[in-house]
């Protein structure tokens, strides 16, 4: 075995620790041999018993590591060491070490939580924190806690916060020294623009190619950037001994193996890779790394229930991983296409995917595992309640779980298929063999990058027709991967290949079964649609799909206020399940209750008919709700009502001990359903229009909410009017914002009034707003006696000048008060 690898130095410690502890955390830098050497040394320590499962985040790494381990013991992959990835496996009855992708372990646990025959599970490259690894670890820990206390769990990584994981798993830590050669880091003067990444990377590759020896590994965010960069480099390097190879997940296994194989004699290699090449993979001869500083991250939009890829800055731990690729075989160089200053702004660690991903597959797997509450699992990072709620909502609509979160029979079948629950529902919803074959073709097209993405049409049927045409002519080209996936699904569903033409509406019906909230109805302008989940979307006006009345949407971009449709098919309204609802609502424009019987698909109304015998209680609830929303203006909220509210509020301020009822507008709106229903129905008839509701005497209704004994107190403490010497009864204004109630009265009506009137049993003086004959304020006072003795004479001069025909006596206290004009 490779005893020269650094990981060999900790092999004995690992075996000793596993005899004493159930869990273990191992850290070792890139190139230490942890992924290839340690599983073999652990197997030796097991004395020929049991099996080891090792999880890798990527298929390519799983294959290469298994093949490398097998070669170390002089065997082909599939004997002692094998691998199992999606749609491919090399294992046998002799296999003792299985290298798996993370989703495979989840399905194994769902099928058999005891994992009979398995002694050790290794989570390799755990720092990547994919949702699959977090779920697999949570399920494994749950199995260990409940039924497999003898199961050993090992977490392995090069860069990770070991303290948090050791604490969560109650696990010791074993650290391995590395064998890294020095790597010189060269920073860019300015940051790379994510929209021109491929150009910047191509320029950096050419610079490194001129100035240094060795193969080059360049990291770009995604497949599209790689393809653009590849075109530039191939054109520039034509006629040289340098070969350019792409490396990303959608490449065939054969092309991936060719990319990571050693260079031919006299040849230089440039590998353009996604983050697939950050860890585990060994690419022989690499001495130069070009790091764009970006990656593609799947972001789940809670508002729309959709996920979309975003190009984002990498974290520091990712940058360290990438840099390490340059120092595995010799001294190396790493070009970082960002400034040293901006590096301080980068996150230390990448976010766990579980914080932002679509949790629907995860929640279904948990239900199939036997846990109805995902939060009951021992998570390293707990998923958000809102994302779990959305996932459960979708699974309910797909009939995969029950209301209590337990898995249905259909849901268990869905969980057994290696695909998203939507895709599984579509395939399992198919009845005939022809439908199943069609669903398999559609599933393959939906899972892979659209080969016709540059085509302006969103027609899904067109893609199926093209796939079947190419397959029949045995000229698959870029459809090869899709054809392979479709074949694997047909094998699982036990149906034969079918290349016959398909009915577009049948395609639409299958899409609708997978995406029930994405059934779309045409609205307004050509190309504008609204989905049954409520979101507005659009299709290019030149797309023939834009002319249909109803569509089922398979793919769209959720960015912005309107989603753009990429894949769709027409659907017949007769093929879609509808629900009938009695819709009672308040029509603000008409000012009336609207009662309709509606046939709906989700939030879309297919048909609406008026009804006249709706439930009275429901109608009353709708009116009360409308009042809460639109305000008391729906009723006759007049000055009389406002004055009553103000009187009661003043008494509450003066006497909090009296427990006066709350007649504030805010409280009345909040409690409308408590006081209003009795008055909506009178003598068996409901008031259902604004006109009828405004006939209600709101002041009388509110006064009735006040107990009789308190009514008497209010009338006594805060009377509505007060008599003045002229004989007039003047209304008292209890307006808010003033300490004292206001009495607005013409000055002439107060001749002979010696003292300021009081309310509240003489505790509150009124604020006298004395008015001119033209009802204009001339004086404010709470001390009427002082006014007569002083200020009155100044006011009298001005009033005599402005109102010479009126009587302005020199001795107002002995003069007769008048209402109108008293001639001199």
Which residues are covered by each model-predicted region?
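P-loop NTPase motor module signature
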Residues: 1-426, 494-498, 538, 555-557, ...
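Charge-dense polyanion-binding interfaces
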Residues: 122-123, 243, 252, 256, ...
């Amino acid at each position: 075995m490779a005893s020269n690898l650094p990981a060999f130095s900790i092999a004995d410690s690992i075996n000793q620790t596993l005899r004493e502890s159930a869990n273990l955390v191992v850290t070792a830098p890139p190139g230490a041999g942890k992924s290839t050497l340690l599983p073999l040394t652990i197997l030796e320590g097991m004395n020929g018993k049991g099996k080891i499962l090792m999880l890798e985040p990527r298929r390519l790494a799983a294959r290469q590591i298994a093949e490398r381990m097998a070669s170390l013991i002089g065997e082909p992959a599939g004997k002692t060491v094998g691998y199992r990835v999606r749609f491919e496996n090399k294992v046998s009855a002799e296999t003792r070490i299985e290298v798996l992708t993370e989703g495979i372990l989840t399905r194994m646990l769902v099928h058999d939580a005891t994992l009979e025959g398995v002694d050790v599970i290794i989570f390799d490259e755990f720092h990547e924190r994919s949702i699959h690894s977090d779920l697999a670890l949570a399920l494994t820990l749950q199995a260990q806690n409940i039924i497999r206390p003898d199961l050993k769990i090992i977490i392995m990584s090069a860069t990770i916060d070991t303290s948090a994981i050791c604490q969560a798993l109650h696990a010791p830590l074993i650290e391995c020294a590395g064998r890294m050669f020095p790597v010189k880091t060269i920073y860019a003067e300015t940051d790379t623009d994510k929209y021109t990444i491929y150009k910047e990377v191509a320029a950096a590759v050419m610079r490194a190619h001129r100035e240094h020896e060795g193969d080059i590994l360049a990291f770009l965010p995604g497949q599209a950037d790689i393809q653009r960069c590849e075109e530039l480099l191939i054109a520039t390097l034509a006629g040289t001994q340098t070969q350019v190879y792409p490396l990303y997940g959608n490449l065939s296994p054969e092309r991936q193996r060719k990319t990571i194989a050693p260079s031919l004699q006299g040849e230089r290699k440039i590998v353009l890779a996604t983050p697939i090449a950050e860890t585990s993979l060994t690419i022989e001869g690499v001495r130069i790394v070009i790091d764009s500083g970006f990656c593609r991250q799947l972001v789940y939009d809670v508002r729309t229930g959709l996920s979309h890829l975003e190009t984002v800055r990498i974290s520091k731990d990712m940058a360290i991983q990438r840099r390490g690729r340059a120092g595995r075989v010799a001294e190396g160089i790493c070009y970082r296409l960002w400034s040293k200053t901006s590096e301080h702004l980068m996150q230390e660690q990448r976010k766990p995917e579980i914080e932002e991903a679509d949790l629907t597959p995860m929640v279904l797997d948990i239900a199939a595992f036997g846990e109805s509450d995902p939060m009951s699992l021992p998570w390293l990072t707990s998923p958000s309640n809102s994302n779990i709620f959305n996932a459960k909502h979708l699974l309910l609509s797909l009939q995969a779980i029950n209301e209590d979160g337990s898995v249905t029979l259909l849901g268990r079948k869905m969980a057994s298929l290696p695909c998203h629950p939507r895709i599984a529902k579509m395939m399992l919803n198919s009845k005939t063999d022809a439908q199943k074959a069609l669903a398999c073709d559609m599933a393959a097209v939906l899972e892979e990058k659209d080969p016709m993405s540059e085509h302006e049409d969103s027609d899904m049927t067109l893609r199926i027709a093209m796939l079947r045409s190419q397959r029949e002519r045995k000229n698959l080209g870029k459809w090869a991967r899709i054809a392979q996936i479709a074949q694997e699904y047909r094998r699982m569903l036990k149906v034969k290949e079918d290349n016959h033409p398909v009915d577009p509406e049948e395609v639409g019906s299958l899409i609708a079964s997978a995406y029930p909230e994405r059934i779309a109805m045409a609205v307004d302008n050509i190309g504008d649609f609204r989905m049954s989940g409520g979101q507005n979307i659009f299709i290019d006006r030149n797309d023939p799909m834009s002319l249909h009345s109803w569509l089922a949407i398979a793919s769209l971009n959720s960015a912005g206020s309107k989603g753009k449709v990429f894949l769709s098919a027409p659907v017949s309204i007769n093929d879609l399940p509808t629900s009938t609802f009695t819709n009672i609502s308040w029509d603000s424009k008409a000012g009336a209750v609207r009662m309709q019987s509606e046939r709906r698909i989700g939030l879309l109304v297919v048909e609406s008919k008026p009804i006249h015998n709706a439930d009275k209680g429901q109608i009353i609830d709708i009116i009360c709700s409308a009042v809460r929303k639109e305000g008391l203006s729906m009723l006759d909220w007049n000055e009389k009502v406002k004055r009553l509210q103000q009187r009661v509020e003043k008494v509450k301020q003066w006497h909090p001990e009296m427990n006066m009822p709350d007649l504030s507008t805010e409280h009345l709106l909040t409690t409308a359903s408590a006081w209003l229903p009795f008055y909506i129905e009178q003598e068996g008839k409901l008031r259902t229009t604004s006109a009828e509701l405004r006939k209600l005497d709101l002041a009388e209704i509110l006064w009735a909410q006040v107990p009789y004994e308190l009514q008497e107190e209010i009338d006594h403490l805060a009377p509505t009017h007060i008599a003045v010497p002229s004989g007039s009864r003047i209304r008292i204004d209890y307006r808010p914002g003033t300490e004292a109630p206001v009495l607005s009265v013409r000055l002439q009506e107060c001749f002979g009034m010696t003292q300021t009137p009081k309310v509240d049993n003489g505790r509150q003086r009124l604020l006298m707003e004395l008015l001119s004959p033209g009802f204009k304020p001339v004086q404010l006072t709470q001390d009427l006696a002082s006014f007569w003795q002083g200020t009155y004479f100044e006011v009298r001069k001005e009033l005599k000048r402005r109102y010479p025909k009126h009587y302005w006596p020199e001795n107002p206290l002995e003069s007769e008060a008048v209402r109108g004009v008293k001639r001199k």
